[in-house]
């Protein structure tokens, strides 16, 4: 995981910052920080014709609220923070999905608020490191999924926080969850696949696409 993080950091660091580093990203720029359907399909290697977008994070309940958003960018976790605006999107291949991708972007008033949020999340994620938790997630089709999640090691290098986990509800899925804090923005991406571990752990690849955009808005 450390090697992948180092690669990700190298790609995310802007060669030339086109935005004024002393200025803040505005809430109106959120949509420019979201990956496109085509970008997600290219990274995941499958068609993702189903798309859901919303001006909020995701609904998720867990028996371990002290673990924050280790599974998914959740309303209960993000609403503890003073973010100004948040958008989320979920893309999947078909009902019941073999491949699922979701992303949340939150804009804060200051860089320090964004960093403070991700620092708090890092502490919460580590609370559940190498443990099993139970979650109740509002699925993309509106149903409620009960799942058991086996959380793996939590890894952090600079402003990139990552975890891989196995999720078991009606099917067994491999997932990767990555959180980036850059400027006054937090970007949260999760990828899941029921096909293989390598297919499920591609959140880094999507973060390499959208992370540098924080310096372009």
Per-range role (PLM):
Residues 1-19:
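Secretory targeting and sorting signals
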Residues 18-92:
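N-terminal "mature-domain start" segment
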Residues 47-49, 55-62, 125-172, 216:
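Short Gly/Thr-rich strand-loop-strand
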Residues 100-102, 170-177:
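Short, surface-exposed coil-to-beta transition loops
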Residues 87-119:
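A short acidic-to-branched-hydrophobic micro-motif
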Residues 101-104, 180, 184-193:
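Short, well-ordered beta-strand elements
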